[in-house]
Amino acid sequence: MLEEAGMPPGVVNFCPGSGATFGNAIVEHPKTRLIAFTGSKKVGLDIHARAARTREGQIWIKRTILEMGGKDSTIVSTDCDLDAAVEGVVAAAFGFNGQKCSACSRAIVEDAVYDVFLERVRERVQALRVGDPAENASMGPVVNRSAMQTILSYIEIGKGEGRLLTLSLIHI
């Protein structure tokens, strides 16, 4: 798309790959000018520290853009469009199976609309179709077994902290 807009080939490259191999090579290479990373705080801080070190043949300071494990919230007030709030929260929380830096991880809801909002979110989530995303399902698998185990551990933490869990886990 960038090339179609007139950008010369190779100026911007999207290069997904294993962080332990491809990612480390990019961070360490003396000709890398900018590193954009989305992931854990631990890995992001490591990338930042390594990018700050100069290497033989490096002629500029590397820049970093680091999006690291945040807690994205949505505020639902009594005067909001409740239908839009429900759709927005469900899309933000469950889009890409929650595997994105902007996944909504909490909703702060005014008492006056709390029960109605919760019920509508519950209904909307229960209507999500689980399956192969290539077949128009709302939710598919997470990226790997490690991600699944992390999600399951978060659920257990939430239960242990007395957090409200309103839906059953679907484990295929």
Predicted regions and their residues:
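Accessible peptide chain termini
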Residues: 1, 169-172
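PLP-dependent aminotransferase-like
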Residues: 1-23, 60
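ALDH superfamily catalytic-core signature
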Residues: 28-29, 34, 42-170
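Phosphate/diphosphate-binding loops
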Residues: 37
